[in-house]
A protein has these predicted regions:
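Glycine-rich phosphate/pyrophosphate-handling loop used in enzymes and phosphotransfer proteins
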Residues: 1-144
Length: 144
């Protein structure tokens, strides 16, 4: 069942009529991206192999129009972008993911931004895959 938050987002920022990357009115794909922007996107390979981490997924490479939108999401209060970015995130089927743990923000940074973009993104990924989110598992101690 669609959450109230998602229904509100659909009313304000409807899927299907405006590209979330270039803001042009155009036919968009299931990720909310027009054909022109789609050709510029580089999806990150999933999963990434990092020796010291059991598993890690990234939706998009931080380049081109995606980099600008990621900055807007993190620093300009454009919370609605979380659902678009979540659409690009894929959890491999062979992973037995029990919980999604967002990276916390230091309280100073949280006060500056007004929200934790990682927690918001994890909410949409949780809805996509039906995996619970635990925002209390990690604590940010040092402001980096």
């Amino acid at each position: 069942m669609k959450s109230f938050f998602n229904a509100l987002l659909d009313a304000v920022y409807p899927f299907g009529c405006v590209c979330f990357l270039c803001d042009s009115e155009a036919l968009v794909d299931e990720w909310g991206v027009c054909l022109k922007c789609r050709s510029t996107l580089n999806q990150s390979p999933s999963p990434l192999n990092i020796d010291s981490i059991d598993g890690f997924c990234s939706g998009l490479s931080y380049e081109g129009p995606a980099a600008q939108k990621i900055r807007e999401f993190k620093y300009s209060g454009k919370r609605f972008l979380a659902r678009y970015f979540a659409g690009f995130m894929n959890i491999p089927g062979h992973w037995n993911v029990e919980v999604i743990i967002p990276v916390p923000l230091h309280r100073k940074r949280l006060k500056e931004r007004g929200y934790n973009q990682s927690a918001l993104l994890s909410k949409f990924v949780s809805e996509k895959y039906g995996i619970p989110v635990d925002t209390g598992m990690l604590q940010k101690v040092v402001n980096t």
